[in-house]
């Protein structure tokens, strides 16, 4: 119950600040604070960014107050590896001494909040989607032996399998749709054909407008 209240309070606070953007005078200032809180520092120059940020310290305090305690108690009843795409459960389980914790990173850009207070002593294994995410994790202090470059976790319906048939066809269609003035293809057609295939780079009649 206490953890549920904690999650509910966090959710209400986030929703309030997000919606407050439309409030005259103070709305943009409040949203600016939230935006600054979630800020990711520039990638370059590559440097050591392992020192905990305010966001990291806040997550650590909330975990000390019981955030994530419920999931830790549940997984201890059947000690299987914990695989999560959200950093808070991973950090909470690691802090509680759970031995096998895997965190799936689904973004190319990630903040310091994905990594616990003391990354060098943590046991969390990170599954990174791209080289940039790998370098971010390194700069946040995660040792190389706990970072695995696995790619983005796309379903087969999106990729089409090992040959990426569906993905290549979809990217080809999107590139043509995003280049109505034919400025991209005269410069980059050779590369597009090489990676996507000639049939996926053909000109097509305009598709009907769809709203999603």
Locate predicted features.
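Active-site glycine-rich loop that binds ribose-phosphate moieties when present
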Residues: 104-113, 129-131
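A short, charged/proline- and glycine-enriched loop
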Residues: 78-79, 98-99, 205-211
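Conserved N-terminal ligand/cofactor-binding loop architecture of enzyme catalytic domains
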Residues: 2-77
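A nucleotide-sugar donor-handling region in carbohydrate enzymes
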Residues: 123-212
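A conserved, positively charged/aromatic
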Residues: 75, 114-125
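Active-site proximal beta-strand in glycosyltransferases
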Residues: 81-84, 90-109
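A short acidic (Asp/Glu
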Residues: 93-96, 113-115, 138
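Short, conserved loop/helix-junction motifs that constitute active-site signature segments
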Residues: 96-98, 117-122, 142
């Amino acid at each position: 119950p206490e953890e549920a209240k904690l999650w509910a309070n966090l959710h209400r606070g986030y929703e309030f600040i997000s919606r407050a953007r439309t409030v005259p005078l103070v709305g943009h200032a409040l949203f600016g604070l939230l935006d600054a809180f979630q800020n990711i520092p520039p990638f370059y120059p590559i440097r050591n960014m392992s020192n905990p940020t305010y966001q990291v310290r806040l997550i650590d305090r909330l975990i000390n107050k019981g955030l994530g305690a419920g999931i830790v108690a549940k997984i201890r009843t059947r000690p299987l590896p914990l695989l999560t795409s959200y950093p808070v459960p991973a950090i909470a389980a690691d802090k509680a001494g759970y031995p096998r914790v895997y965190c799936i990173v689904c973004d190319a850009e990630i903040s310091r909040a994905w990594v616990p207070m003391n990354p060098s002593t943590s046991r969390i294994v990170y599954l990174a989607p791209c080289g940039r995410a790998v370098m971010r994790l390194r700069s946040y202090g995660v040792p190389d032996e706990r970072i695995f470059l696995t790619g983005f976790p796309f379903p087969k319906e999106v990729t089409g399998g090992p040959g990426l048939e569906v993905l290549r066809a979809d990217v080809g269609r999107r590139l043509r749709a995003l280049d109505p003035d034919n400025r991209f293809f005269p410069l980059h057609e050779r590369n597009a054909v090489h990676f996507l295939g000639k049939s996926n780079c053909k000109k097509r009649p305009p598709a009907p407008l769809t709203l999603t």
